[in-house]
Amino acid sequence: NEALRQALRDYHAPADLFLVGEQVERDGETAERQALMRQWEKDGHHLHNHSYSHPAFSQTDLAAYLANVSRGEAVVEGLRDSDRTSPAYPHFYRAPYNDLGGSAEKYQALNAALSKAKVLPAPFTLHNHDWRFEEAYSKALADGDQALAQRISEAYLQQLQLEFDFAEQLSRDTFDREVPQVLLLHANRLNADHLGAVLKKLQERGYRFVSLQQATADPAYAIADGSQGTSGISWLHRWRKTLGQPDRLGEEPPFPAWLEKPAQ
């Protein structure tokens, strides 16, 4: 956590954190974990709900899922600055696996519940498979293979560039301009070691770092989500579906094939 926070401080980058409630409420560790999350908010970052136990919506009963979302929101609400010494901010919810239920009924029920709670669905426009790189990276470190860990790190940063090349071009092809990008990352060892390098590369591409609230103020984010599916495709692809534009999902940069074996 400290390495992530330091990298964000170094690049003056605000982060929006999506918390799984049961990972905050741990026997014998709850108070310590709550204090850590509150420190993130004191640093100027925003805390949001990612459910209580990370269920897949399409594989969970609707009532049980909505109860899980509500329970997760209660955990996060208990962490937010009750004294409001920091500015208030909109609350977002990111569905685990970005699984939106797989049916219109479930999708609409979730949106209705979020709207009633004054919580917004959280979009993203790109990711760089960080959780998959993390599997290989952590295994290499556990095996003491520093050379492989370094090679994975380099591939990870190269993947970042490929993902941004694609997302920027897809934005131009969709809107004739570049919309603010929302990068999905996970708190893991890989990013603890390399978030500074990630932010440096984005800064070199000309990006400035803003909150999710600021990014989603762009008119593109008001376009309806054209997908009710179970997979975590980016909102650029979802908007294209809504706008009736050709599917470009198959053009996404592939995950490096050579990494599949080390990650096993």
Task: Name these PLM-found stretches.
Residues 41-49, 73-80, 146-164, 233-255, ...:
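Short, basic, helix/turn surface patches
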Residues 55-81, 103-117, 125-177, 191-194:
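Alpha-helical scaffold elements lining the catalytic groove of polysaccharide deacetylases
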Residues 19-23, 51-53, 97, 125-128, ...:
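A mature extracytoplasmic/lumenal domain signature
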Residues 43-47, 115-120:
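Glycine-enriched alpha-helix->loop->beta-strand junction motifs that scaffold or abut catalytic
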Residues 31-33, 63-65, 136-140, 223-228:
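Short low-complexity, flexible loop/linker segments enriched in glycine and/or proline
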Residues 179-185:
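Generic beta-sheet signal
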Residues 1-98, 103, 183, 201:
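Active-site beta->alpha N-cap acidic-glycine motif
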Residues 15, 25, 123, 189-264:
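C-terminal domain-boundary segment and adjacent tail
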